[in-house]
Amino acid sequence: MALYMVVENFRNGDALPVYRRFRDHGRLAPEGLSYISSWVTESLDRCYQVMETENRALLDQWIANWNGVVDFEVHPVIVSKEAAEKIAPRL
């Protein structure tokens, strides 16, 4: 399973449309895309979210469901233990 750090920039810095859509429709994630956790800035204009999937296309499908209220940045990430193992031979 691949992990993705998703940075959600709420359109016009406005969290209301985002939370209304979430309240009314839920996360809108397709089957096979799993929500891990998220953190929202105190200013309520940005969310940092970790998602997991084997199929990157599912992430794009989920992003399309939020079109109009959120601008996305997607970064593939690995856990710290895996990063340490990956860099160890070069130390």
How would you label these PLM feature ranges?
Residues 66:
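Short, conserved SAM-binding/catalytic segment
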Residues 63:
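Short, flexible helix/strand-to-coil boundary loops that buttress conserved ligand/catalytic motifs
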Residues 1-46, 54-58, 78-91:
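Short S/T/G/P-rich N-terminal loop/turn motif that feeds into the first structured element of a domain
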Residues 69-80:
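Conserved short beta-strand edge segments in small beta-sheet-based binding/regulatory domains
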Residues 17, 60, 71-73:
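A short, polar/proline- and glycine-enriched secondary-structure boundary/capping micro-motif
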Residues 49:
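Extracellular/luminal beta-rich ligand-recognition
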